UniProtKB/Swiss-Prot annotation:
Residues 353-419 form the S4 RNA-binding domain. This is Tyrosine--tRNA ligase. The keyword Cytoplasm applies. HAMAP family: Tyr_tRNA_synth_type1 (MF_02006). Its EC number is 6.1.1.1. A motif ('KMSKS' region) lies at residues 231-235. The lineage of its organism: Bacteria, Bacillati, Actinomycetota, Actinomycetes, Kitasatosporales.
Length: 422
């Protein structure tokens, strides 16, 4: 079996480690019980979180036991943001978000077998803790000079916003999580993003002080960057969430399908569970025939299936093909069609209007005269049917599910019209 540290490094998933050689030995002697934490600071996880979940999945598949921690306690506080204090959410909201995050993490881990995953909530060991117990049993192991030196804290201390004692103490709570999981489950490794390195090492430092004989580790994954300099996991429409109500499966699929050729190799290694040979073959195809987008299609299908399931993925692929004239729009169910069209430029009209008006209104062309030229040149389509006449007006019978028209200029320029009249 491939050494899991070598595997993670090949995939570009190792940025920082407390002691790589010691960690490698721990895995060799294994199994290792490890954890990664997720704070409920939003009602859904996002692609940055997905990196961590899939890293957990890889380490579990190598024979180790994952603990998925959802921070019912740390989520009530929040780790320090770079420039300002967080707005505290109510206990009720945080409790609801805890359950939503648990439901998103659980399908991606294996909860059966000898190394079955376990979900934990740090509220379980903090809510009954008195202030005196916290200060005597945990706080005494932390040194303020080291806490101040953590990047997240020092940055805030040097800003106009400053930092509250609440957020300053966040690293103590996260360190306490590692200690508690070490004592309860024999957990000896915490994984997380390299931007959380200060919090990760708070845990290892605490354990070294409280349990001097313990051997524990931290592993940090790198910040994912994109070749064009834009932030990973965001589009013009906003953050890519795992919750299908916040980011549709269609938009999720399209995010990966639209990956830059310069990024797709990195994304395959980080997110895909394909073998080295399969990934290298897709990399070769991208280099030789980039227009085929074979790597992007493979990545989009695999990840959409992982997060949203095979049925949703099949519907999304059918919608994607149909929108570009490679399938029947009439065969798409209303929910799938509506989700796909919501990602396109679109307008609402009371009644079907002349095609030239619709093309201009939705900005597929610059003007009505440009729309007429497009029709004359054979480049205008409504519901994948070429528009033959410059004065064409869609009939109500043409509306998909009684309300939608899909406009296309050429092969790739799409827009939607929603007809709202009865």
């Amino acid at each position: 079996m491939t050494d899991i540290v070598d595997e993670l490094k090949w995939r570009g998933l190792v940025a920082l480690s407390t002691d790589e050689d010691a960690l490698r030995k721990a895995f060799a002697d294994g199994p290792v019980t490890f954890y990664c934490g997720f704070d409920p600071t939003a009602p859904s996880l996002h692609l940055g979180n997905l990196v961590q979940i899939l890293t957990m999945r890889r380490i579990q598949q190598a024979g180790n036991r994952p603990l998925g921690l959802v921070g019912g306690a740390t989520g009530l506080i929040g780790d320090p943001k770079p420039n300002s204090e967080r707005t505290l959410n109510s206990r009720e909201v945080v409790a609801e978000w805890v359950e939503r995050l648990r439901a998103q993490i659980a399908p991606l881990l294996d909860f059966e077998g000898p190394n079955a995953a376990i979900m934990v909530n740090n509220l379980d060991w903090t809510q009954g803790l008195s202030a005196i117990e916290f200060l005597r049993d945990v706080g005494k192991y932390f040194r303020v000079n080291k806490m101040i030196a953590k990047e997240a804290v020092s940055r805030r201390l040097n800003s106009d916003a400053g930092i509250s004692y609440t957020e300053f103490s966040y690293q103590i709570l996260q360190g306490m999580d590692f200690l508690e999981l070490y004592r309860r489950y024999g957990c000896t490794l915490q994984t997380g993003g390299s931007d959380q390195w200060g919090n990760l090492t708070s845990g290892t430092d605490l354990i070294h002080r409280a349990e001097p004989d313990a051997v524990v580790h931290a592993l940090g994954t790198p910040l994912i960057t994109k070749a064009d300099g834009t932030k990973f996991g965001k589009t013009e429409s906003g953050t890519i969430w795992l919750d299908p109500e916040m980011t549709t499966p269609y938009a999720f699929y399209q995010f990966w399908l639209n990956a830059d050729d310069r990024d797709v190799s990195k994304f395959l290694r980080i997110f895909s569970f394909k073998s080295h040979e399969e990934i290298e073959e897709l990399e070769k195809q991208t280099e030789e025939r980039p227009q085929a987008r074979a790597a992007q299609r493979a990545l989009a299908e695999e990840l959409t299936t992982l997060v949203h399931g095979a049925d949703q993925t099949a519907a999304v692929i059918a919608a994607s093909k149909a929108l570009f004239g490679q399938g029947e729009l009439t065969e798409l169910d209303e929910a799938t069609l509506a989700a796909a069209l919501s990602e396109l430029p679109h307008v609402k009209v009371a009644e079907p209007a002349p095609v030239v008006d619709l093309f201009a209104e939705v900005a597929l062309v610059a003007s009505k005269s440009a729309a007429r030229r497009t029709i004359k040149e054979g480049g205008a389509y409504v519901n994948n049917v070429k528009v033959a006449a410059e004065d064409a007006v869609p009939a109500k019978e043409d509306l998909l599910h009684g309300r939608w028209l899909v406009l296309r200029r050429g092969k790739k320029n799409l827009a939607a019209v929603e007809v709202t009249g009865g």
